[in-house]
Amino acid sequence: MSHILDKIDTVYPFPPKPIPLTQDEKAAYIASIKQLLKEKDAVLIAHYYTDPEIQALAEETGGFVGDSLEMAKFGNRHPAGTLIIAGVRFMGESAKILTPEKRILMPTLEAECSLDLGCPADKFTEFCDAHPDHTVVVYANTSAAVKARADWVVTSSIALEIVEHLDAEDKPIIWGPDRHLGSYIANKTGADMLLWQGECVVHDEFSADALRKMKAVYPDAAILVHPESPASVVELADAVGSTSQLIKAAKELPQQKMIVATDKGIFFKMQQLVPEKELIEAPTAGAGATCRSCAHCPWMAMNGLKAIETALREGGEQHEIFVDEALRVKSLIPLNRMLDFAEKLNMQVKGNV
């Protein structure tokens, strides 16, 4: 069973939307980025939720597109000395934790994540210290400082198995930061979980009422839902899973139409695998409401061509990720604990946002 803290409604200030580029400007930046990647011994690594042109450029230049842990692992294995991470700040930190000897650049260090922002390390540590008998399990979508306070770091693809393992040992659990994913796992496992009250601004906006209406319009469509969505939305799903798992489900399910309840950035890779299928954005607001994120992370949208080119060309403290070495070593412990557990289960760890 889960014990839920009082919900604190937080309205995160969104960054301004990037200024659109002309086709000529895009072509010029792409050409410059390709040249700079060679000159700087760098590789472009992009998250599924970045804009399609960024994902396409990463693949075209021998880089990678994936979820945050896959991104960090690819960067660790790649011979390039510099990794340019197109994503949000904790993804750059994850890459630095796994590969401290490499230079980690980001298009902007102001690309945040509402899950990270909603789980400040000092407050989370204070909360954990108040419950010393609990095992602390945190989602990968957190800062290095929060990871360092945890006993386990998990992604959504292995969270169920790890919580089941801890529950079998009768260990009460503190889960942070996503309340929807935590509630989903608690309901699936029956584990005793104390939930931190964070949420993803994109997934939190998906509406069950609006989704039912859309399903009535597309009765033959399958509904794919990320478990960071509200429980009422998850209940309507034909498939629930991480980014990688939803892409796999789109390929394996027989339906030719898919209503997809996650960031619409995923459509680029999903459509590559199922070009014959129709992908439909799940509605992010009910009748009479307006959306804020509108199914696309506003911080992911900051990873534009101009920002990537500037990061590669100029570098500097405005673009480079640094993690205190003592903190890095401490945060690596719960991360390796997950990877070792996955190896014993012979699972490939994927699936945080």
From Swiss-Prot:
Its cofactor is [4Fe-4S] cluster. Keywords: 4Fe-4S, Cytoplasm, Iron, Iron-sulfur, Metal-binding, Pyridine nucleotide biosynthesis, Transferase. It catalyses: iminosuccinate + dihydroxyacetone phosphate = quinolinate + phosphate + 2 H2O + H(+). Its main location: cytoplasm. InterPro entries: NadA, NadA_sf, Quinolinate_synth_A_type1. [4Fe-4S] cluster binds at C113, C200, C297. Belongs to the quinolinate synthase family. Type 1 subfamily. Catalyzes the condensation of iminoaspartate with dihydroxyacetone phosphate to form quinolinate. This is Quinolinate synthase. It comes from Vibrio vulnificus (strain YJ016). The gene is nadA.
